[in-house]
């Protein structure tokens, strides 16, 4: 419990540093690392409670919205959104991490995740991590029509490619900053309007 109190304090302090400036502050939340029954030992309600506690602290700090990212399980992200909505009416953005076929580690398809989470009232949906911008653009283009029909804007937060190890043990990514940024117009032209980066 002490480490959670410390995390709450740090999250509050960081959020308070940015609140009130000419930008929006997102309360970023990641997976718990728990698997919900029957795939693990955690119950749905336990995971809802974990996210509600985090969201309550972030909400009290004055964040403008929540972003639950790097999700590998629709079941867990449903618990996250449920927990957040129990304590706050602020917008909730969700990004999933998927393989090159558009499936999470738990086997969930992106289109199914989008539909299920739209029913819970999320404000934006997309992907982060696991791909460079070229592959992520391909995956998200397949969701544009569905996202428009649901009224849920799409988010893209790719890596700068995948990391590679150098002979000296250091790592590098495929794309430099300029090459990475050059993909932005393609995302925008495809109807994907919330852009960022990951890793």
Where are these regions (language model features)?
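Domain-level signal for soluble alpha/beta catalytic cores
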Residues: 1-199
């Amino acid at each position: 419990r002490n480490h959670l109190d410390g995390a709450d304090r740090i999250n509050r302090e960081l959020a308070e540093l940015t609140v009130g400036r000419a930008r929006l502050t997102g309360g970023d939340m990641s997976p718990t690392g728990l698997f919900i029954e029957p795939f693990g030992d955690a119950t749905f309600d336990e995971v809802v409670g974990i996210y509600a506690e985090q969201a309550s602290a972030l909400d009290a700090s004055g964040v403008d919205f929540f972003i639950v990212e790097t999700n590998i399980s629709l079941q867990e992200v449903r618990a996250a959104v449920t927990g957040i909505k129990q304590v706050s009416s602020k917008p909730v953005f969700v990004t999933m991490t998927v393989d090159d076929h558009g499936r999470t580690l738990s086997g969930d398809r992106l289109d199914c995740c989008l539909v299920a989470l739209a029913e819970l009232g999320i404000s934006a949906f997309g992907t982060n991590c696991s791909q460079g911008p070229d592959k992520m653009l391909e995956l998200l283009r397949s969701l544009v029509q569905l996202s428009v029909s649901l009224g849920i804007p799409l988010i893209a937060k790719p890596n700068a490619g995948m990391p590679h190890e150098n002979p000296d043990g250091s790592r590098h990514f495929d794309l430099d900053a300029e090459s990475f940024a050059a993909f932005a117009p393609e995302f925008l032209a495809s109807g994907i309007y919330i852009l960022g980066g990951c890793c």
